[in-house]
Amino acid sequence: KNEKKALENLIASLKKISQKTPPEEIQTKIYAVGKENGYSDNLRDWFKLIYEVTFGEENGPRMGFFISFFGVKETIDLMEKKLQI
């Protein structure tokens, strides 16, 4: 699996949503991107990867709610900075 490519796909997906998108819908998109990028069998690893990049930890809050609270653009900026895109 190409982890960086999967995260880039997540960022691209986040760029298509608005700040007003409900947290549940954001969470659904995160699951969909994970499944599309080879994490269907182990979504736990997908979220672990997101947490490691975003927070430097293996665990974290529900990402849909975090992104909704922190901000879509702010989350994208944070992830791009961590990935050095």
Functional labels for PLM-detected ranges:
Residues 1-85:
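Conserved nucleotide- and phosphate/pyrophosphate-binding catalytic cores
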